A protein has these predicted regions:
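Divalent metal-dependent phosphate-bond-processing catalytic cores, especially two-metal-ion Mg2+/Mn2+ enzymes
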Residues: 1-10, 16, 20, 24-31, ...
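DNA-binding alpha-helical recognition surfaces that contact promoter or target DNA
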Residues: 38, 59
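Short, glycine/acidic-rich hinge or "gate" loops at secondary-structure transitions
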Residues: 50-58
Length: 157
C-alpha cells in the first residue's frame, strides 16, 4: 500500500515503528509504550534518521496502544474523545493513518491464546476492527473540522 498511501519517508517511519513498537517490553516496566518511545528516539538518532522520521517513529511507538484503548473504552460519538485522540498524533492526518495501520498490524499479529492477557485486551476481531475504525473516523473528523475552521493547513489527499 506504500505507493498509494505513503511517501517513502512516512513508509520508512511506519516500518520502523512496526519493528520498534514493543522495544520497551521487559520485566518491571509498567508502560512499555512510553519506555519504547524513549528507546526509539535514541535508536533513530544513532541510526542517523532525520528529525521528522525520528519524531513520527517516537509518536507511533508511544501511542501504538492508544487507538485500541480509546476504541474499547471511550465513546467515538463524543467530539472531545475524537479531539483527544487527534492530539495524540499532533492532529496530523498522516500520523493518524499510520497509527491506524500500526494498530491493525499489531492487533492482527496477536493470537487468541486463552491464557494470554494481552490477546484478550488487544487481539483483533471484526468487532475490534469496527470499534477501531469508528474511533479513527472520530479523530479524522476532529482534524477535518479544525482544518475547515482555519486551525490548521492539512492536505487530506
Amino acid at each position: 500500500a506504500r505507493g498509494e498511501r505513503y511517501d517513502d519517508r512516512h513508509y520508512t517511519a511506519l516500518l520502523l515503528a512496526g519493528l520498534l513498537h514493543d522495544v520497551g517490553k521487559r520485566p518491571f516496566v509498567t508502560d512499555h509504550a512510553a519506555e519504547g518511545a524513549r528507546h526509539a528516539a535514541v535508536i533513530m538518532k544513532r541510526m542517523g534518521f532525520d528529525a521528522d522520521i525520528a519524531r513520527w517513529v517516537r509518536i507511533l511507538v508511544r501511542e501504538h496502544l492508544t487507538l485500541s484503548e480509546f476504541a474499547t473504552g471511550k465513546n467515538p460519538n463524543d467530539p472531545a474523545v475524537g479531539e483527544s485522540l487527534a492530539r495524540c498524533v499532533d492532529r496530523d492526518p498522516m500520523l493518524l493513518d499510520m497509527l491506524y495501520d500500526l494498530t491493525r498490524a499489531d492487533g492482527s499479529s496477536l493470537g487468541a491464546t486463552a491464557g494470554e492477557e494481552i490477546s484478550k485486551r488487544y487481539g483483533w476481531s471484526h468487532w475490534r476492527e469496527s470499534l477501531v475504525r469508528a474511533m479513527y473516523s472520530a479523530a479524522r473528523e476532529s482534524i477535518r473540522v479544525q482544518v475547515e475552521g482555519g486551525y490548521a493547513d492539512v492536505d487530506f489527499g
